[in-house]
Amino acid sequence: MAAATSVPVKNWGLFLDGQWVSEGEPFEIHSPFDRALVGKGFRATAAHAEAAVHAAQRAFEITKKMPSYERQRILRAISEGIHIREQEFAQLIALEAGKPIKTARAEVDRAVFTFAVAAEEATRISGEWLPLDWQPSTVGRAAIVRRFPLGPILAITPFNFPLNLVAHKLAPAIAAGCTIVLKPAPQTPLTSLLLAQVIEGAGWPAGGLNVLPLAIPEAERLVGDERLKLLTFTGSGAVGWALKQKAGKKKVLLELGGNAGVIVHSDWDADDAARRCVEGGFSYAGQSCISVQRIYVQRSVYQEFLTALVAGVNKLKTGDPLDESTDVGPMISEDAARRAAAWIEEAVAAGAKIETGGKRNGSILEPTVLTNTWHELKVACEEVFAPIVNVEPYDDFDDAIRCVNDSPYGLQAGVFTRDAKLLFTAFEKLEVGGVIAGDVSAFRIDHMPYGGVKDSGLGREGLRYAIEEMTEPRLLALNLQ
């Protein structure tokens, strides 16, 4: 395995109450590609967590009164600050997450957009004028409904999008006037700390953002802390639902796992659908909750689609994430790649066929296409979170819908058809948070509502929708007589 391009190793402190604090248990972050040292930091203690909550409470007295134009200005400055440091962010994401550099740049661009949209939404948190004269006894009465920020919130983020999924917590919180205690993923905390530098420079008040790499016990104590008014969590279903039980009275926003299905009907160009499924299934080694995992193709075009899909997958280049030509880098760890390879072996032992891929080299798993799978196999019924897709034929469109729905998850699904009736049938019957027409499940633009049903979570992200989660309506009833 060739070595990744070396970069200077930086020491990172905690970001606590507007200060960079070099305290706590030291840790090192290593590249999942070649185990090269990427950076060093400190794991926060229970005392740091307590200080962060106090800081967030104190800063909230400032942010809840901050006018919308000022929140807009800060968010625009954050967006511009990320853009100015695009290469620095992209390289750090590639190193600590193993994401191919060109994919990392796309993530940075998305984060720039996320904060820019949040800046506009900060000025659109509107209220409502509500007439109350619906009965004779209430003539002359009316009401105003206005949204107020909840207060300090707790954000827990995953490794796979260490910038943009953090942005999806921080940007709407700042737009709403909430303060934040952020626990980044232990595999990728450095990108969050770099983002904290940008937010600090943009003028968000001290204590308004606290970034603490925390061990699980300290993080769980924060989850149960009633001074934090909302938990926004993105990660695995098992962890998310367990945290919900510990969250007490606070609001909970969960963006959890997926097992995304795609339907390819015969009236859509098979080559085009295959091309999109290659990108949607193997970008960032399939480590996204909306990555294409299960593909159901109408039998009349099944072989044509499969041939095109395998040809496209075989063109993908695996390797060093800092190499501009790399399409698929490592998984987040060798253990993760080993687990995914074991699932492939289990499927093959049960009769599945490897059409391409299937081999592992350290943390890199070859992009893999499986056929002759069925629901009970782990590669089909669980979230694979790896560069693996299953392709199966169907005869009747309703059967394809039933196959997609035969999952504990319901995040997004893709439907390739030009038949409007079939499309709206899918829209009505698919048990998911989002149906993507003419594209794969992995499509997401950052201002759209995003979230799932069943085991895939609670609530919605996507700036305006997250702001609604982070604010609460308050009524002023008026007697105007």
Predicted feature residues:
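Terminal low-complexity tails and localization/encapsulation signals of metabolic enzymes
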Residues: 1-40, 73, 77, 127-154, ...
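ALDH superfamily catalytic-core signature
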Residues: 9, 238-374, 397, 403, ...
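Residues at or immediately preceding the N-termini of alpha-helices
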Residues: 32, 46-49, 68, 101, ...
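Residue-level signal for inorganic ion chemistry
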Residues: 35, 71, 93, 115, ...
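Conserved C-terminal structural/oligomerization subdomain of aldehyde/semialdehyde dehydrogenase
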Residues: 36-40, 204, 228, 263, ...
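Glycine-rich loop-to-alpha-helix module at the N-terminal edge of alpha/beta enzyme cores
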Residues: 36-126
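Short, well-ordered beta-strand elements within core beta-sheets of diverse protein domains
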Residues: 38-44, 58-65, 154-155, 262-265, ...
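Rossmann-like NAD(P) dinucleotide-binding subdomain of oxidoreductase/dehydrogenase enzymes
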Residues: 130-272, 394
